[in-house]
From Swiss-Prot:
Subcellular location, record wording: Cytoplasm; Nucleus; Cytoplasm, Cell cortex; Cell projection, Stereocilium membrane
Domain Myosin motor positions: 47-731
UniProt binding sites for ATP: 88, 96, 139-148, 192-196
Taxonomy of the source species: Eukaryota, Metazoa, Chordata, Craniata, Vertebrata
This protein's name: Unconventional myosin-Ic
Coiled-coil ranges from the UniProt annotation: none
The organism of origin for this protein: Mus musculus (Mouse)
Alphabetized Pfam families for the sequence: IQ, Myosin_head, Myosin_TH1
Domain IQ: 734-757, 758-786
Assembly description: Interacts (via its IQ motifs) with CABP1 and CIB1; the interaction with CABP1 and CIB1 is calcium-dependent. Interacts (via tail domain) with PLEKHB1 (via PH domain); the interaction is not affected by the presence or absence of calcium and CALM. Interacts with POLR1A. Interacts with POLR2A. Component of the B-WICH complex, at least composed of SMARCA5/SNF2H, BAZ1B/WSTF, SF3B1, DEK, MYO1C, ERCC6, MYBBP1A and DDX21. Interacts (via its IQ motifs) with CALM; this precludes interaction with YWHAB. Interacts with YWHAB; this precludes interaction with CALM. Interacts with RPS6.
UniProt main location, coarse: cytoplasm
């Protein structure tokens, strides 16, 4: 085993337990994890983990460069004190697994590298230990990763918190509320494919055990104008596309929808229905499953989808002008679907879309609408239906998340953790009413942030007994007052202009702003600006100098969006809806309420003030999300875009406030445990109080009085360079410590190994000696008994088997069988066999027979098909000629060849005449005439059905096997043979006399092909053959010194052949 000490960017010591499974332990000098300080040694490459430790903390360039270094190394999280800055990597970094959750669970904030889970765990532990409500505020630009951060936080709490006693239903509903809210509240924008188009604040309630038992969601400023209009390259809310793509055929048929989004006016304006990064079909399945988890009944789902479909049908309602220029509905089919889906009367809806009800002096009058007004009424209804449905949806989810134990006494012991996912500061080329509200929201949150940050800093200084140094910072209360002040604020002026009688327009609102607000250091219009500034301001614009910079707003649409008017008769129509959800969204009490509803800006202001109070009552934690580029590409760092976000998120102001006093503070125990190795007096162990040990340590390190302060429980270090110098000294010291640790470890390890080996050797020796002694004694005893039994058996070996000789006889038999196993015959020709004892003679013969059969069987199994055919032919030749023909022994060692003539040696005309008949064997022969016995060269061909005699390119004779009656050959060494044919066959001229140099091979193959093995006659003396019709010929055979074939004087063919073998 080896101990490997290595300094890596996270400051971890790696102990290698297994070569393929390193065990990582983040250790200080005596085992305390202080990862943040450890990472300082790699700061030149990966930057600092806390911006507070930047030397040039006032430099925006240094701030961004530190972000760049960390982003380049896939380190997307960095702290500004307790604030977490997150850069969206646009890819999965595999840092959110269960293993990562366990790594951050129950660990101090600075003991592990910056991570979302570190913030989540710190907040959760504070909630449990201090019993104080907590809040995590997540802000950033669209596409910066706010929604993803919220989901990861919920995932962390769902995985790591203890399960409630009544199961994990609340936990599942908290998680499953996200897909539903994303479907109805998120959309694809130019900056983000899953952009939240509303602000969300979620409370998660925990019981005294730390288990989630309930929740509540607040939504802010849904962008309902997106329902009726989208910019180029953007989409409507996800749910519309999910329904069309993933909805079942039966559902779409019931809703009167078709799958093509291009068929719906509200879905085509952005010209971006399909997005490669979005799988609407899969998201639909997730959303539908989530609805069932959060207690939606099938009827409620059906009613909800009917409303979604009704918005699409409403967008397809078209109008045409009659002769009085009044609008009339021309799309009857869409109107029919609308009345059914919304549960209203068709005539009532038609009238509400084309007329406006006016109440004057107690009388109700219907005023017809022109085309423009009708389109406005239609779009206003669509926005109202969708936005109110969204509000109902949030209420429904809240009912599902509400704790069932709210009435029990233990409910008082619950604590709340709030998650705020809110839009970041927005500055576009064209900024309107929505950006005004969003930026006002950010101003209020920035005001709260500065207030709570300064308060937290001041409380920590006071608790530690450190003198508080006033911090100079920009107080944006002046901007908040400019927007929200009663009577003189922008919202009040906007409301007044919306409510006053007469012809109010966006420009009259701007004129009133100029008259009321001027002069103001943070407000500017074309009229109030100087000559130079007027060039950048149109007459219909005003500019606010926010904490994050200047933003120019166009007043176009301010009054309309703030009023958010819905004609009375449209409200009446929707109040009569038979759709249960619509009936809840449009309460009939609205009709009897004569009070004018609050404007959108006022509603938002009141909601925001309520939110600020909620957040002020909690202990805050902050996550600032940054988008690295607009192209959503991984690894791309757009410095201009990031500088813009750093400015609008107020990160430099945040850092400046944090650095106004001391840059670094740490508990005495942690500081001493990390750096005590730098001082001989504190190393290796300090026996006194940690505070006294730190005092000794800093004196040894030479800290100047202005560089640090000693608090009650912490040391405060003013400058990062002081900490860097200390960390660099520790790095040098650590190298020597690592060497000493390795040396001590090796010595200890090898000594322990030696002692183990020594103890093992002594134990093994002792055991082995005993074992050998016992084995020796047992062997001697066994040997004596065996010898005694063998002698007794030998004496009685000829007696019948009895207990006295059974052992001996078994020994003899076993010995024979073992000897036989070693001396088995090696092949079929080996006839050796050991002599068996008398008792095994019969068994020996049986074994010998079995052995021979086995060898023969193995030999037969091993031969190839070609060799098998060769042996079969040789066996037939042996059966025919062995002991009968004198030259047979000379043919035995010669292999039979498949053919003696190649195809190229046979005339093509002969092959053509044979047709498809294959040639099985071909050999050159000599034919002797039947009369004069003149020899003539010929070719003998064997086919499957006949023997063919060929002369050059001509078939001279064909003898079918059926007409071949026999074959004659002499017993001498000559090579003549006669093929006998039927005399009755008129086609044949007579028997054929042939001579072949390979007579044994030729006759064997002919006999096999013609199936005439038993028809070969071996004659002695002479052979008689049919020479023609009514005439026979005779061949006489005699022995001589050499082969001679001639015609004798008696007219016979005389053959003299030498005798090769003695009989």
């Amino acid at each position: 085993m080896a101990l490997q000490v290595e300094l890596i960017p996270t400051g971890e010591i790696i102990r290698v337990v297994h070569p393929h499974r390193p065990c990582k332990l983040a250790l200080g000098s005596d085992g305390v994890r202080v990862t943040m300080e450890s990472a300082l040694t790699a700061r030149d490459r990966v930057g600092v983990q806390d911006f507070v430790l930047l030397e040039n903390f006032t430099s925006e360039a240094a701030f961004i460069e530190n972000l760049r270094r960390r982003f380049r190394e896939n380190l997307i999280y960095t702290y500004i004190g307790p604030v977490l800055v997150s850069v969206n990597p646009y890819r999965d970094l595999q840092i959110y697994s269960r293993q990562h959750m366990e790594r951050y669970r129950g660990v101090s904030f600075y003991e592990v590298p910056p991570h979302l889970f570190a913030v989540a765990d710190t907040v959760y532990r504070a909630l449990r230990t201090e019993r104080r409500d907590q809040a995590v505020m997540i802000s950033g630009e669209s596409g910066a990763g706010k929604t993803e951060a919220t989901k990861r936080l919920l995932q962390f709490y769902a995985e790591t918190c203890p399960a409630p006693e009544r199961g994990g239903a609340v936990r599942d509903r908290l998680l499953q509320s996200n897909p539903v809210l994303e479907a109805f509240g998120n959309a694809k924008t130019l900056r983000n494919d899953n952009s939240s188009r509303f602000g969300k604040y979620m409370d998660v309630q925990f019981d005294f055990k730390g288990a989630p038992v309930g929740g509540h969601i607040l939504s802010y400023l849904l962008e309902k104008s997106r329902v009726v209009h989208q910019n180029h390259g953007e989409r409507n809310f996800h749910v519309f596309y999910q329904l069309l793509e993933g909805g079942e055929e039966e559902t779409l048929r019931r809703l009167g929808l078709e799958r093509n989004p291009q068929s719906y006016l509200y879905l085509v304006k952005g010209q971006c229905a399909k997005v490669s990064s979005i799988n609407d079909k899969s998201d639909w399945k997730v959303m539908r499953k989530a609805l069932s988890v959060i207690d939606f009944t099938e009827d409620e789902v059906e009613d909800l989808l009917s409303i979604v479909a009704s918005v699409l049908h409403l967008g397809n309602i078209h109008f045409a002008a009659d002769e009085d220029s009044n609008a009339q509905v021309t799309t009857e089919n869409q109107l029919k679907y609308l009345t059914r889906l919304l549960g209203v009367e068709g005539t009532t809806l038609r009238e509400a879309l084309t007329h406006r009800k006016i109440i004057a002096k107690g009388e109700e009058l219907l005023s017809p609408l022109n085309l423009e007004q009708a389109a406005y009424a239609r779009d206003a209804l669509a926005k109202a239906v969708y936005s109110r449905t969204f509000t109902w949806l949030v209420r429904k989810i809240n009912r599902s998340l509400a704790s069932k134990d709210a009435e029990s006494p233990s409910w008082r012991s619950t604590t709340v953790l709030g998650l705020l996912d809110i839009y970041g500061f927005e500055v576009f080329q064209h900024n309107s009413f929505e950006q005004f509200c969003i930026n006002y929201c950010n101003e209020k949150l920035q005001q709260l942030f500065i207030e709570l940050t300064l308060k937290s800093e001041q409380e920590e200084y006071e608790a530690e007994g450190i003198a508080w140094e006033p911090v100079q910072y920009f107080n944006n209360k002046i901007i908040c007052d400019l927007v929200e002040e009663k009577f003189k604020g922008i919202i009040s002026i906007l409301d007044e202009e919306c409510l006053r009688p007469g012809e109010a327009t966006d420009l009259t609102f701007l004129e009133k702003l100029e008259d009321t607000v001027k002069p103001h250091p943070h407000f500017l219009t074309h009229k109030l600006a100087d000559q130079k500034t007027r060039k950048s301001l149109d007459r219909g614009e005003f500019r606010l100098l926010h904490y994050a910079g200047e933003v120019t707003y166009s007043v176009t649409g301010f009054l309309d969006k703030n009023n958010d008017l819905l004609f009375r008769n449209l409200k009446e129509t929707m109040c009569s809806s038979m759709n249960p959800i619509m009936a809840q969204c449009f309460d009939k009490s609205e009709l009897s309420d004569k009070k004018r509803p609050e404007t959108v800006a006022t509603q938002f202001k009141m909601s925001l003030l309520q939110l600020v109070e909620i957040l002020r009552s909690k202990e805050p934690a902050y996550i600032r999300c940054i988008k690295p580029n607009d192209a959503k590409q991984p690894g791309r760092f757009d410095e201009v875009l990031i500088r813009h976000q750093v400015k609008y998120l107020g990160l430099m102001e945040n850092l400046r406030v944090r650095r106004a006093g001391f840059a670094y503070r740490r508990k005495y125990e942690a500081f001493l445990q990390r750096y005590k190795s730098l001082c001989p007096e504190t190393w290796p162990m300090w026996a006194g109080r940690p505070q006294d040990g730190v005092a000794v340590l800093v004196r040894h390190l030479g800290y100047k009085p202005e560089e640090y302060k000693m608090g009650r429980t912490k040391i405060f270090i003013r400058f990062p360079k002081t900490l860097f110098a200390t960390e660099d000294s520790l790095e040098v010291r650590r190298q020597s410590l690592a060497t000493k640790i390795q040396a001590a470890w090796r010595g200890f390890h090898w000594r322990q190994k030696f002692l183990r080996v020594k103890r093992s050797a002594i134990c093994i020796q002792s055991w082995w000696r005993g074992t050998l002694g016992r084995r020796k004694a047992a062997k001697r005893k066994w040997a004596a008994q065996t010898i005694r039994r063998l002698i007794r058996g030998f004496i009685l070996r000829h007696s019948p088997r009895c207990p006295e000789n059974a052992f001996f006889l078994d020994h003899v038999r076993a010995s024979f069988l073992l000897n036989l196993r070693r001396q088995l015959p090696r092949n079929v020709l080996d006839t050796s066999w050991p002599t068996p004892p008398p008792a095994l003679r019969e068994a020996s013969e049986l074994l010998r027979e079995l052995c021979m059969k086995n060898m023969v069987w193995k030999y037969c199994r091993s031969i190839s098909p070609e060799w098998k055919q060769q042996l079969q032919q040789k066996a037939v030749a042996s059966e025919i000629f062995k002991g009968k023909k004198d030259n047979y022994p000379q043919s035995v060692p010669r292999l039979f060849i498949s053919t003696r003539l190649g195809t190229e040696e046979i005339s093509p005309r002969v092959l053509q005449s044979l047709g498809s008949e294959p040639i099985q064997y071909a050999v050159p022969v000599v034919k002797y005439d039947r009369k004069g016995y003149k020899p003539r060269p010929r070719q003998l061909l064997l086919t499957p059905s006949a023997v063919v005699i060929v002369e050059d390119a001509k078939v001279k004779q064909r003898i079918d096997y059926a007409n071949l009656t026999g074959i004659s050959v002499s017993s001498l060494s000559d090579s003549l043979f006669v093929l006998h044919v039927q005399r009755e066959d008129n086609k044949q001229k007579g028997d054929v006399v042939l001579q072949s140099d390979h007579v044994i091979e030729t006759l064997t193959k002919t006999a096999l092909s013609a199936d005439r093995v038993n028809n070969i006659n071996i004659n002695q003396g002479s052979i008689t053959f049919a020479g023609g019709p009514g005439r026979d010929g005779i061949i006489d055979f005699t022995s001589g010194s050499e082969l001679l074939i001639t015609k004798a004087k008696n007219g016979h063919l005389a053959v003299v052949a030498p005798r090769l073998n003695s009989r």
